[in-house]
């Protein structure tokens, strides 16, 4: 019996285009100004040091740090200090009203239905927990954070690593067989399934394609997901 949902965001609850065409360009445009204006912020200081560790250059200049961060955005690298910095930048954007999150109508309706029925819902995204909460705090359906019992990012592990899903199951207190994982990424689906999760792959028409002979269920919309039939 499914007692918990663990869902991805990008390409699952939210269009990839929102992340790629709205959030990423916004952070790229603002990153240099934000870092230079917040050098006294302990969080920013730690991010700068983490970038230096990531590139194995402890004496890297601020300009080198910023250029690496910009390159990682362009290359869509899932690197923790970048994701944490993007979260801080997006926070300013959401608070100023320049950014608003977007959630698919079918995702909103199903998430609310599951929440109302007592199923616990958790988020697992490569974006930082801060960025996840920000996206859902200001959406086309208002603040949706009340729907979620917890959030996970790459601090718990890589999304394509079986052990990440083992850790999450322990953390939320459900056995893998009681959890349904939703994602558009086939490698993440396979990793979660190998940890014993129930899995369904989202194939949004504009974001992904059906994979022939894929060993797990694929759907185009949350409307096709019936918990009792998983």
UniProtKB/Swiss-Prot annotation:
The EC number(s) this enzyme carries: 3.1.3.77
Cofactor(s) the record lists: Mg(2+)
Superkingdom of origin organism: Bacteria
Catalytic reaction annotation: 5-methylsulfanyl-2,3-dioxopentyl phosphate + H2O = 1,2-dihydroxy-5-(methylsulfanyl)pent-1-en-3-one + phosphate
Sorted UniProt keywords: Amino-acid biosynthesis, Hydrolase, Magnesium, Metal-binding, Methionine biosynthesis
Pfam families, sorted: Hydrolase
SUPFAM superfamilies in the cross-refs: HAD-like
PANTHER family to which the protein is assigned, alphabetical: ENOLASE-PHOSPHATASE E1
Stated family: Belongs to the HAD-like hydrolase superfamily. MasA/MtnC family.
Stated role: Bifunctional enzyme that catalyzes the enolization of 2,3-diketo-5-methylthiopentyl-1-phosphate (DK-MTP-1-P) into the intermediate 2-hydroxy-3-keto-5-methylthiopentenyl-1-phosphate (HK-MTPenyl-1-P), which is then dephosphorylated to form the acireductone 1,2-dihydroxy-3-keto-5-methylthiopentene (DHK-MTPene).
Quaternary state and interactors: Monomer.
Protein's UniProt name: Enolase-phosphatase E1
Source organism phylogeny: Bacteria, Pseudomonadati, Aquificota, Aquificia, Aquificales
């Amino acid at each position: 019996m499914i007692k918990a949902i663990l869902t991805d965001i990008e390409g699952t609850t939210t269009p990839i285009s929102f992340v790629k065409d709205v959030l990423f360009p916004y952070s790229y445009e603002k990153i240099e100004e934000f870092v230079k204006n917040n050098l006294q912020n302990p969080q920013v200081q730690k991010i700068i040091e983490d970038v230096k560790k990531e590139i194995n250059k402890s004496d890297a200049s601020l300009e080198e740090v910023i250029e690496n961060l910009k390159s990682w955005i362009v290359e869509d690298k899932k690197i923790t200090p970048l994701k944490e910095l993007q979260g801080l930048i997006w926070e300013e954007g959401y608070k100023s009203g320049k950014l608003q999150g977007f959630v698919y109508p079918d995702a909103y309706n199903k998430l609310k239905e599951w929440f109302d029925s007592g199923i616990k819902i958790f988020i697992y995204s490569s974006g930082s927990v801060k960025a996840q909460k920000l996206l859902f705090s200001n959406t086309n359906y208002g603040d949706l954070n009340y729907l979620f019992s917890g959030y996970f990012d790459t601090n718990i592990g890589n999304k394509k690593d079986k052990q990440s899903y083992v850790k999450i199951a322990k953390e939320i207190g459900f056995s893998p067989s009681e959890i349904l994982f939703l994602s558009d990424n086939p490698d993440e689906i396979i990793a979660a399934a190998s940890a014993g999760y129930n899995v369904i792959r989202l194939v949004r028409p504009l974001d992904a394609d059906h994979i022939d002979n894929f060993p797990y269920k694929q759907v185009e919309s949350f409307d096709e997901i019936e918990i009792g039939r998983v």
